[in-house]
Amino acid sequence: MAHKKGSGSSKNGRDSNAKYLGIKKFGKQIVTPGQIIVRQRGTKIKPGLNVGLGRDYTIFSMIAGRVNYSTQKNKKIVSVDPSYGKIQAIEIRKASHFAT
């Protein structure tokens, strides 16, 4: 008899690895150059001033400063304000140095 059994368990039971997408730094948090602010698929959030856009649409900080989210024409935009970051970035580096 040329029939298959009805179990089908070998076709099920797969799952993809977690991609850990989302906002990594929220508004008014301090960032240093190169820190990831948003991991996303596509440009749900657009890059603003002092941030870069990676080829996988990751938004990262290009300078030290404070993260700022805003909306323009119904589009979310993230930027980094440099005026606050200079003093705080030095403090973060000192704190991380003492933590190790």
UniProtKB/Swiss-Prot annotation:
Entry keyword annotation includes Repeat: no
Lineage of the species this protein comes from: Eukaryota, Rhodophyta, Bangiophyceae, Cyanidiales, Cyanidiaceae
Subcellular location, record wording: Plastid, Chloroplast
Gene3D superfamilies found in the cross-reference section: 2.40.50.100
Swiss-Prot/TrEMBL GO biological process terms: translation
Domain of life: Eukaryota
UniProt source species: Cyanidium caldarium (Red alga)
Similarity annotation: Belongs to the bacterial ribosomal protein bL27 family.
Coiled coil start-end: none
Keyword set includes Chloroplast: yes
GO cellular component terms, semicolon-separated: chloroplast; ribonucleoprotein complex; ribosome
Protein name: Large ribosomal subunit protein bL27c-1
Xref: NCBIfam families: L27
UniProt cross-references to PANTHER family, sorted A to Z: LARGE RIBOSOMAL SUBUNIT PROTEIN BL27M, RIBOSOMAL PROTEIN L27
GO MF entries: structural constituent of ribosome
Name of one Pfam family that matches: Ribosomal_L27
Alphabetically ordered keywords of this record: Chloroplast, Plastid, Ribonucleoprotein, Ribosomal protein
